């Protein structure tokens, strides 16, 4: 089983990691993207990414100083511990023990505009490059064309190695799209979380993001590897709804 997550814009490098580390699979492709971004002035970055002048300058500096990370340093640390934001508030990777992190390293994958795909312990430098960015490269007019089928093949090979067909989608549409059209024999499961508000159960964006992280945390802590066990998810008062669920979309409801 593989679980895919989106990354986060908020990063935190102010921590010490006692975990092992690994190296991203597509560093040569990341370097090509950085070489492209290094040619752009802050005003170009601001326009391309819709950033303030301050954020554009910060990321200009990041691109200029970027190099492939192969050892831990002040600005090179394991990806799942660096990412903050709603999903990672739910995940709370800093609380995972070594056994849980080992499970996460095998089963969790973070989709990334710059790195393509990251394992939890893959070393990552600070960056900003969302998957939906219309960055033109020699491969095409956006990052989906740049990555092509590389990320999909990586995930399919991981599933093959695990003798599994189960892909848990806890990523946003923007990021999951990089996986392209998956083979029909891959069982894609997309958990959905709804909260009771104004007389109805509905998806609330902030909670939905945090809940994806909660689901990932629960899977890691319980070392879940099959679809049937997902219905047991019960963190933060969520309960599985058989009535609202389908074969590929398990629905979890929470009443305040």
Feature locations, PLM:
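Active-site helix-to-loop segments that bind/position phosphate- or nucleotide-bearing substrates
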Residues: 4-95
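Internal, well-folded beta-alpha domain core
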Residues: 93-246, 251-256
């Amino acid at each position: 089983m593989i679980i895919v997550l989106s990354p986060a814009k908020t990063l935190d490098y102010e921590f010490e990691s006692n975990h092992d580390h690994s190296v991203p699979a597509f560093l040569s492709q990341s370097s090509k993207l950085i070489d492209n971004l290094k040619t752009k002035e802050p005003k170009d970055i601001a326009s391309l990414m819709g950033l303030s002048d301050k954020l554009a300058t910060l990321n200009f500096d990041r691109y200029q100083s970027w190099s492939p990370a192969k050892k831990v340093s002040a600005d090179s640390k394991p990806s799942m511990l660096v990412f903050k934001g709603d999903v990672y508030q739910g995940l709370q990777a800093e609380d995972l023990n070594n056994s849980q992190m080992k499970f996460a390293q095998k089963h969790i994958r973070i989709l990334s505009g710059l790195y393509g795909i990251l394992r939890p312990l893959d070393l990552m430098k600070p960056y900003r490059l969302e998957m939906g960015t219309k960055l033109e490269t020699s491969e095409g007019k956006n990052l989906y064309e740049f990555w092509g089928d590389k990320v999909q093949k990586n995930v399919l090979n991981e599933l093959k190695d695990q003798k599994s067909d189960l892909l848990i989608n806890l990523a946003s549409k923007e990021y999951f799209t990089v996986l392209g059209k998956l083979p029909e024999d891959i069982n894609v499961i997309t958990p959905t979380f709804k909260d009771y508000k104004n007389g109805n159960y509905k998806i609330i964006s902030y909670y939905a993001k945090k809940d994806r992280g909660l689901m990932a945390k629960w899977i890691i802590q319980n070392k879940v590897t099959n679809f049937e066990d997902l219905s047991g998810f019960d963190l933060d008062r969520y309960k599985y709804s058989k009535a609202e669920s389908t074969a590929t979309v398990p629905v979890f409801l929470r009443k305040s």
